[in-house]
Amino acid sequence: MVWEQRWHPLRREWVIVSSHRNERPWLGERVAEAARQLPEYVPDCYLCPGNARSSGTRNEQYGGVFVFDNDHPCVAFTAPVPPPAPPDGIYRNSPAHGVSRVVCYSPRHDLTLAQLPEADVLGLLQALQAQYRELSARAGVRHVLVFENKGEVVGVSNPHPHCQIYATNFVFKTIESEAEVQAEYFAAQGRPLFPEIIHAEEADGRRLIARREMALAFIPYFARYPYETFVAPRATRASLADLTAQELQDFAAVLRETLIRLDNLWRMAFPYVMVLHQAPTDRPYPGFHFHIEIHPPLRKPGLLKYLAGPEIGGGNFLNDTAPEEKAAELQAVSNVHYTQGGEGRRRAAEGGDGEGS
């Protein structure tokens, strides 16, 4: 049992870890697993090749990664200039300017990122590198946020595999805070902060999920969610676009293996919110270390990690599981996707692949 506070050095906040609470009685809502018996093509899906979107624009007959401007953008350079703020000086407003894009991973409606071949995952990351380079060079763009929402329980409106890009005239708060923390650490210590986290995780070893020469994945000591996983290059790079070809190849392999292990845990399309933490683009940010954070909302099959009083009201996360225990579960499953012959949890007594849980 783990029952303590753990310091989150990137966010400068305490995470309450109380693993005994995961076994508490539960009479509340359970979420059903979304059906994965999906066809390869859906005629009325606005992301499938050749189909019309709500704007009337018809998608290309694409065969790989497909990128287009979002028909319902969060930010746009065509957004109107807001009216003057109230005159009392307390309230302020600002234009919501930027670029919103959708990135389809595959023409196949029935696949997820975890099911794509490694070469296709690499191709996606290369496409995202190109998007970052293009958008970060635009006047008025201060930050390029890339994220994927996967699964109905996180509010996804379409299961066709895709992510989104918001290139904005402001810096999203979490990234702004992380950039400040890492810059301050770099100025004070003369070295980046994130490699210290990597060193601590490798020295401990219990929370590691996947490793290659130039990249690794782990559930951090200070994880806020059950199964929250970081995927990072070993070298400090400010953005995905800064990774070398070999670094990107290892990063793609580690990311894919991590997502496969999550799916294999309960033999399902594991839901998550996945965010690329990249340095803002408006100026240099010394010491910023690009990485991906994966935030799965489930703590058990059918049971969500709800954000409630401590998180929403108090501002500190309460993790009902021990990161070491959750990492051990992911370590114990196959790195071959269950739809391709991989298994779920291994039988500890046999030390090999066993029946899926």
Per-region residue spans from a language model:
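Active-site microenvironments that recognize anionic phosphate/pyrophosphate groups
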Residues: 1-160, 166-238, 260, 271-274, ...
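A contiguous, surface-exposed recognition patch within enzymatic or periplasmic domains that forms
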Residues: 230, 238-247, 251-255
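Extended C-terminal subregions enriched in glycine
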Residues: 250-269
